[in-house]
A protein has these predicted regions:
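Conserved class I S-adenosyl-L-methionine
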Residues: 2, 6, 13-80, 278
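SAM-dependent methyltransferase
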Residues: 185-246, 258, 262-263
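Class I SAM-dependent methyltransferase SAM/SAH-binding core
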Residues: 93-139
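A short SAM/SAH-binding and catalytic strip from SAM-dependent methyltransferases
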Residues: 150-165
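A short glycine-rich, Lys/Arg-flanked "PGG" loop and its adjoining helix->strand segment in the class I
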Residues: 168-180
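Core SAM-dependent methyltransferase catalytic element
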Residues: 270-289
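A short acidic, Gly/Pro-enriched loop at the edge of an enzyme's catalytic core
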Residues: 142-151
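Class I SAM-dependent methyltransferase "Motif I" SAM/SAH-binding loop
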Residues: 89-91
Length: 289
């Protein structure tokens, strides 16, 4: 759902209700949903972000590669859409549409009502209209246990959740919702690629030092201007951190696919220092039987 700058139960889903378009609002911290930073809240409420989203990401190299790896990693769907996949942080439905076309019963979850409206106006919008849930990824109690076969969380959406405890709570929810043996496909950006140039290396070091002094800051946290928002939040991972978080949340990590610095291909020579060379990772994890 986000790219940093360069250098109810699923069986009882209700149709997405239309709401009047409104400007983004600035909420005080005590009114923010759990795990949602102020800039992220504005992102989810801004009509302008949703309306231009598809065009904005169209030239991003990661677009296309992540969908291909997702469809290659998931087992083939059963006939008559009997294989249910949750797209967590579905945005305007980029992955939802691809999974629907591949024969999956695709359900989308997102906190942004404007983004969810965008799903209904795109390809397969009518089919997907009743398969959309507005929810905070950290608070997925609205979804019953063992009701999805697989799940995905692409485009560094998990990095938009503020706080490691909250990110792990999200992963724990997904492990509860996905049936035993099901897959989770998740993308994260790699914080350790920052060493490639001097400004990024300085930011990497500053983040490390700040994490030792400030309990509210975690190594890899970034706050930056993004499409008119002054303080967009994103947490970037290390290879070891995403592995540990998945395991601690009830997942078995089957593979961590390192991506090239621009995200446009799998990292060439992937076996050589992927933790430092990769621009990000796509993790393939399975819920134990």
């Amino acid at each position: 759902m986000n790219q940093p700058p360069p250098k109810a139960a699923p069986d009882s889903l209700q149709p997405l209700s239309a709401t009047s378009a409104g400007r983004s609002e600035r909420r005080p911290a005590w009114r923010l949903p759990t795990g949602v930073a102020p800039g992220t809240w504005e992102y989810t409420q801004a009509e302008s972000i949703a309306k231009g989203y598809r065009e904005f990401i169209a030239s991003t190299p990661l677009v296309g590669l992540d969908i291909r790896l997702l469809l290659e990693s998931l087992p083939a769907p059963k006939p008559q859409r009997q294989t249910r996949v949750l797209d967590l942080g579905c945005g305007d439905g980029r992955a939802l549409r691809a999974m629907w076309e591949a024969g999956f019963d695709a359900l989308g979850v997102d906190l942004s009502q404007p983004m969810l409206r965008g799903v209904t106006t795109g390809d397969h919008g009518e089919a997907l209209r009743n398969r959309l849930i507005r929810a905070n990824l950290v608070e997925l109690d609205c979804l019953r246990s063992d009701t999805a076969d697989h799940a995905c969380c692409l485009f560094s959406t998990i990095g938009m959740v503020r706080g490691r405890d909250c990110r792990r709570r999200f992963l724990q929810h997904v492990a509860r919702i996905v049936r035993p043996g099901g897959m989770l496909v998740v993308h994260v950006h790699n914080r350790n690629r920052w060493w490639r140039d001097r400004p990024s290396a300085r930011a990497w070091l500053n983040s490390l030092v700040r994490s030792l002094r400030d309990r509210e800051h975690e190594w890899g946290d970034r706050v930056y201007a993004y499409r008119g928002l002054a303080d967009m939040y994103l947490h970037t991972y290390s290879r070891n951190e995403i592995r540990k978080d998945l395991i601690a949340s009830g997942w078995q990590v089957e593979r961590l696919i390192p991506l090239a610095a621009d995200g446009g291909q799998v990292l060439p020579g992937a076996g050589w220092l992927p933790g430092w060379r990769a621009g990000g990772f796509i993790a393939l994890a399975r819920r134990p039987q």
